[in-house]
Amino acid sequence: MNQRNASMTVIGAGSYGTALAITLARNGHEVVLWGHDPEHIATLERDRCNAAFLPDVPFPDTLHLESDLATALAASRNILVVVPSHVFGEVLRQIKPLMRPDARLVWATKGLEAETGRLLQDVAREALGDQIPLAVISGPTFAKELAAGLPTAISLASTDQTFADDLQQLLHCGKSFRVYSNPDFIGVQLGGAVKNVIAIGAGMSDGIGFGANARTALITRGLAEMSRLGAALGADPATFMGMAGLGDLVLTCTDNQSRNRRFGMMLGQGMDVQSAQEKIGQVVEGYRNTKEVRELAYRFGVEMPITEEIYQVLYCGKNAREAALTLLGRARKDERSSH
């Protein structure tokens, strides 16, 4: 591979970053995968697979491992960031001085900025300026299934139509990976953050033993919360019926591959927050997202009762069953009301 002609540089060598890099390489593209831990990258290079997260998926020959950040960023103008939301801004500030002048940035990170609840587009603009094209991909994607080549579909939104078209062409694979374009940059970002919160609630409900009826009600009312917050931020309501909204929400709330759901199940079964996080062993994005989504909802005056009760469990020590009963005990209302 020429050092400057890769189709994409992927920043973040966890399970999802690796899965996306594999998918791109499988599409016939030269891809560079960078991770912050040189020892981890050396292990990936030696094994030619991510044995920790994706042990049964060998790397295509066109997937190149790189531990030097400057070299990785010089390899392509297209940068795909796949890191936890709480380090998103820090990573962008780290890569900014090393990016090519023609660089374009897309992220697969789902969440909001830690503490402030800002959308990641605002974090990116602050870190990188107003000139660089930005994009986001989001949708129902478990890393293991994506890496295995099982059928998957996502949404793609960008501030730049040329970038959106190029990304759709790079990522889309008719056999296994369908990429839908969507002009709603805000909505595609927001869905991925709120669904993490609702998934914890769905897990809590199942952990308590409330059954399928309760889980489905929680998903449906969670979608209503997502849509209300989206409307307040200027998103298109139709986005939340697509891959980045309902699609991701259903997947994350119903399948035990979801860390957020498993975390919630442990809480519903009586485990404390810290012990549940330690047992998961990886980042539970919904833990921080709950605080951030609640902050955003307060800022825009949007009532989100499910999010509020999950916050009370995670940060105020409320019992999961008590939180569920609080929701069930809410006053009667019209299903279509705005609160």
From Swiss-Prot:
Its EC number is 1.1.1.94. Keywords: Cytoplasm, Lipid biosynthesis, Lipid metabolism, NAD, NADP, Nucleotide-binding, Oxidoreductase, Phospholipid biosynthesis, Phospholipid metabolism. The keyword NAD applies. It is an enzyme of class 1 (oxidoreductase). One of its GO terms (molecular function) is NAD binding. NADPH binds at S15, Y16, H36, K110, A143, R259, V283, E285. The active site is at K195. It catalyses: sn-glycerol 3-phosphate + NAD(+) = dihydroxyacetone phosphate + NADH + H(+); sn-glycerol 3-phosphate + NADP(+) = dihydroxyacetone phosphate + NADPH + H(+). SUPFAM superfamilies: 6-phosphogluconate dehydrogenase C-terminal domain-like, NAD(P)-binding Rossmann-fold domains. One of its GO terms (cellular component) is cytosol. PROSITE patterns: NAD_G3PDH. Pfam families: NAD_Gly3P_dh_C, NAD_Gly3P_dh_N. NCBIfam families: PRK00094.1-1 (NF000939), PRK00094.1-2 (NF000940), PRK00094.1-4 (NF000942). Catalyzes the reduction of the glycolytic intermediate dihydroxyacetone phosphate (DHAP) to sn-glycerol 3-phosphate (G3P), the key precursor for phospholipid synthesis. Belongs to the NAD-dependent glycerol-3-phosphate dehydrogenase family. This is Glycerol-3-phosphate dehydrogenase [NAD(P)+].
